[in-house]
Amino acid sequence: MKPYLLSAKQLIDKVKKSELSSVDVANSFIERIEEFEKDVYAWAFFDKTSFLEKAKEADDWRLSGKPLGPLHGLPVAIKDIFKTDDMPTGYGTPIKEGQRSRNESEVVRLLKNAGAIIMGKTVTTELAYFDPGKTTNPYDYSRTPGGSSSGSAAAVAAFMAPVAIGSQTNGSVIRPASYCGVIGYKPSYGLISRSGVLRLSFLLDQVGIFGRTIEDMGLISKAIISKDSKDASTRIYPTENMESSVLQDHPFDPKFVFVQTPKWKNLDSDSKKAFDRLRKKLEKNIVDFQDPSSFEKIFEYQQIIMETDMAHNLSYFYETNKNKIGKKLKEAIERGQSYKSKDYAEAVDNIETLYDNMSELFHHFHAIITPATTGEAPKGLAYTGSPEFCTIWTYLGMPSISLPILEGSNKMPLGVQVVGEKFDDVRFLRSANWLLKKLKK
């Protein structure tokens, strides 16, 4: 099997056993990039020579007999809003194009410490908001890959990278994962540091992972989950044996609750039929849940927090380069400047209250099942799709994952979103793995 087809765990194991060299792995992905990048446009920065040099260094380290990190020799793609000291960080805007930083992001530092090779930077929408970059969907180049982690999802879907790092402030991991037919995992808020990452909102920004297996989600999470003094949201979380723990069988089959959310009316008819079929397959393991009326307010609360924070955090771009930023971003910043402080305070105060109400479900169920998107990836590249099926879970800081289980009428991927209890990510991933195995049979 060609190296680019292997999972991250398989690649690491083969390199450590000397069945593959890191250079072999790098060359396999380089060939793939050279074949498909001209159509997918997943990369904001990729330097073949530098990638091969890093792979050679990884091989030299291994052959010297020195201890190997858990991700030794693994290529990882990074969304172009994470600072890297040896590559430019452009944030998806010409304002920052080609600029470099000496203050590397904590996620990148942890990946390197674990032995990973940062292979390049993936395309993001403009300043991680809605105005799209150049990336296309690998399943259909005429369709959007979603956003804002467009390039990260597309690179994994096109087998140009085994895993990739992205971020989500509303639906920027789950949505592109669904559209591109890969696994996209957003851990609980506070597990992964945002230090050295373009900030939109302290309360909403969350780091995510793209890959092809649940095991790889556990493997990468174990490397980058860490308390960080530079990010006050982070906490200590046990990650020992996380990559194997997520694969363990439940002592009994997990129970799921199906949540339509108030946006169910916006789900296209084909997707509704697909989810009806899914519920029938899981009939012994799933029950329906009546959305509480408080769910409706979450969409307003999330928008108030996100846009108010963007008005503050992106003020440099707005004040110095207003004519160089997109219309959607400019309008969001201007709305953020207009909200009243009491409305912002109400939106913030309700995060904990609404989560407490929601968490009662987990006394009876292992996880929530809900759509990831309103349907297949939309035609055209100007619109990255609606994040509305992700909004509630991002606002509440709950772990969520998009699983490539369903298919739309145009044979495009359709993700199933699974949502778990806050800070119970291992059990949540175990439930997601059970679901993936059962429905992929």
PLM features per residue range, with description:
Residues 22-27, 269-290, 315-320, 344, ...:
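Acyltransferase
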